[in-house]
A protein has these predicted regions:
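Active-site-proximal alpha-helix that buttresses catalytic centers in soluble enzyme cores
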Residues: 9-85, 172
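Phosphate-handling substructures
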Residues: 22-23, 32-37, 78-134
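Residues at the C-termini of beta-strands that transition into short coil/loop
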Residues: 14, 88-90, 175-178
Length: 178
């Protein structure tokens, strides 16, 4: 049975503010930086997020496996009692060169080129199309849920909502065909 095209209400939540200080001090790079926990401000943001009325309308809570998203999701799970699923494929957008400078340059190129990767690009990164495919393939297993809270990352969320800037712990509701 072909099940493509089922609409699921996704309540996107960007993770709280992370604290990279300890990892940067120890020269962590790439996915090593994804071990960063929330900052004190990020924890306050996550606690405030738990008061959002939309969260209680969901059937399931899904989180990226990145520490900052998972820590944010832990607050939501405790406050709402929603079952939590962790998805490693809902990670942050990938830039294939190390360093914050390269990340910011890649982000500028990504935005300038509407998510495409030009053949002569000086930095390699995951395209918008690749991110969408990764997301949809990962989320296919949740088609039987009407409403899912998804704690994830700005660049991934931006592929489905028009906001260019998505604040920490911002809640954005949308229907997505999965």
């Amino acid at each position: 049975m072909d099940r493509r095209g089922i609409k699921v209400k996704v309540i996107f939540v960007r993770h709280g503010e992370p604290d990279y200080h300890e990892l940067e001090e120890r020269s962590y790079t790439g996915f090593g930086l994804d071990l960063a926990p929330l900052s004190e401000q990020g924890r306050r943001q996550a606690q405030e997020l738990c008061q959002h009325p939309l969260l209680r309308s969901a059937d399931l809570l899904v989180s990226s496996a990145m520490t900052r998203a998972l820590e944010t999701a832990s607050y939501v799970a405790c406050a709402t009692g929603l079952p939590l699923r962790v998805e490693p494929l809902l990670h942050e957008w990938q830039v294939y060169e190390l360093g914050m400078e390269n990340f910011e340059k890649a982000r500028s190129l990504f935005l300038e080129n509407n998510g495409a990767l030009l053949p002569n690009s000086p930095i390699q990164y995951e395209t918008a199309a690749e991110m969408k495919v990764r997301f949809l393939e990962c989320m296919a297993k949740y088609r039987d849920y009407q409403t899912v809270v998804l704690v994830a990352h700005r660049m991934l969320i931006r592929q489905f909502v028009p906001d260019e800037t998505i604040d920490f712990c911002q809640v954005i509701e949308c229907d997505i065909e999965i």
